[in-house]
Curated annotation (Swiss-Prot):
Residues 198-216, 276-294 have a biased composition (Gly residues). GO terms for biological process: mRNA splicing, via spliceosome; mRNA transport. The modification N6-acetyllysine is found at residue 298. It is found in: Nucleus; Cytoplasm. InterPro entries: HnRNPA1/A2_C, hnRNPA1_RRM1, Nucleotide-bd_a/b_plait_sf, RBD_domain_sf, RRM_dom. This is Heterogeneous nuclear ribonucleoprotein A1-like 2. The modification Asymmetric dimethylarginine is found at residues 194, 206, 218, 225. The keyword GTP-binding does not apply. Residues 95-185 are annotated as: Globular B domain.
Length: 320
């Protein structure tokens, strides 16, 4: 059996989201460009179901992960005269996590054990790309390790590739890996939930047409219903804009009103967003991504963040 015919690599790992498309781009012209790096098993420009007008983004699916890597290692990509932004497609489940679609070079690693050292993290994560910095967080007073770390890479695709993997094992223990948001992103998220309640800006920083009236970009507002922090609270990843400063100060503030305390429970009031089917931004069967304002999905309530699943889940029980 040829590698391209092998079913062993999940489709989600072989799929790329392509943002910033020209409204003139068709399935055929998108395919013509990206098939230079391998065999495409699927290629689609997402369109408004009523007007059939392009929504400015699409998806391509390769036969192998190796072909995806080859495409991502080639930049820039220009389709129909316009520079586009390919990123590894995010699954529906993962899209509900704050910051799931932001472009960052740093990951948060939670649930690591006290005997985990920097070289253990490096040995595992360097398979995904060049590591610039590893920070294992400790308590300022006691010096005790707090059960989480940050790893910074030289390229955002390394982070995207890591977070779409469901399981990561460091020194024999499963750990939780998520994107780490820069302070300015957290501040934008916090301010967005106080100031913007429109149809939703997907990043807001670059202005490329993403879909309908939405904007696709790298910084700022993800949704008009309250940004990352939910529609009611102080908002943002760090609660009232504290961001990751909370890690080094008093309570390990990670999410609006939540905490990650010494190998323990992660509590968060963050809202969930991004309904997708199999990473298809709503999919062809479940409706357009963002159509009718459907940026939020029902929280999953699947237990704690990392080590314990005894108390609250990642996502509060609110439905938007």
């Amino acid at each position: 059996m040829s590698k391209s015919a092998s079913p062993k690599e999940p489709e989600q790992l072989r799929k790329l989201f392509i943002g910033g498309l020209s409204f003139e781009t068709t399935d055929e012209s998108l395919r013509s460009h990206f098939e230079q790096w391998g065999t495409l098993t699927d290629c689609v420009v997402m369109r408004d179901p009523n007007t059939k007008r392009s929504r400015g983004f699409g998806f391509v699916t390769y036969a192998t992960v190796e072909e995806v890597d080859a495409a991502m290692n080639t930049t820039p990509h220009k389709v129909d005269g316009r520079v586009v932004e390919p990123k590894r497609a995010v699954s529906r489940e993962d899209s509900q996590r704050p910051g799931a679609h932001l472009t960052v070079k740093k990951i948060f690693v939670g649930g690591i054990k006290e005997d985990t050292e920097e070289h253990h993290l490096r040995d595992y994560f360097e398979q995904y790309g060049k590591i610039e910095v590893i920070e294992i967080m400790t308590d300022r007073g006691s010096g005790k390790k707090r059960g989480f770390a940050f790893v910074t890479f030289d390229d955002h695709d390394s982070v995207d590739k890591i977070v779409i993997q469901k399981y990561h094992t460091v020194k024999g223990h499963n750990c939780e890996v998520r994107k780490a948001l820069p302070k300015q992103e957290m501040a934008s998220a916090s301010s967005s939930q106080r100031g913007r309640r429109g149809s939703g800006n997907f990043g807001g920083g670059r202005g490329d047409g993403f879909g309908g009236n939405d904007n696709f970009g790298r910084g700022g507002n993800f949704s008009g219903r309250g940004g990352f922090g939910g529609s009611c609270g102080g908002g943002g990843y760090g609660g009232s804009g504290d961001g990751y400063n909370g890690f080094g100060n008093d309570g390990s503030n990670f999410g609006g009103g939540g905490s990650y305390n010494d190998f323990g429970n992660y509590n968060n009031q963050s809202s969930n967003f991004g309904p997708m089917k199999g990473g298809n931004f709503g999919g062809r069967s479940s409706g357009p991504y963002g159509g009718g304002g459907q940026y939020f999905a029902k929280p999953q309530n699947q237990g704690g963040y990392g080590v314990s699943s005894s108390s609250s889940s990642y996502g509060s029980g609110r439905r938007f």
